[in-house]
Amino acid sequence: MSRVCQVTGKRPVTGNNRSHAMNATKRRFLPNLHSHRFWVESEKRFVTLRVSAKGMRVIDKKGIETVLADLRTRGEKY
């Protein structure tokens, strides 16, 4: 399962760890992903999405119905 938020599209990004001596070693910054069940009133069922914390805030703001409509237009399975 890929580490991508289904709502915002956030993915891992790369950067450097920096020691006290400023030596650089490669690392990945991972999104804060959670599998979360959302109740969809119109369909009378739960939908499980893999979303970041920011994605949950977007769902709180726009509503699950609007977000699911956006996912459908992108052709993403949920």
Swiss-Prot record:
Disulfide bonds: none annotated. It comes from the Bacteria. Gene3D superfamilies: Ribosomal protein L28/L24. GO terms for biological process: translation. One of its GO terms (cellular component) is cytosolic large ribosomal subunit. One of its GO terms (molecular function) is structural constituent of ribosome. NCBIfam families: L28. This is Large ribosomal subunit protein bL28. InterPro entries: Ribosomal_bL28, Ribosomal_bL28/bL31-like_sf, Ribosomal_bL28_bact-type, Ribosomal_bL28_sf. Belongs to the bacterial ribosomal protein bL28 family. Keywords: Ribonucleoprotein, Ribosomal protein. The gene is rpmB. It comes from Erwinia tasmaniensis (strain DSM 17950 / CFBP 7177 / CIP 109463 / NCPPB 4357 / Et1/99).
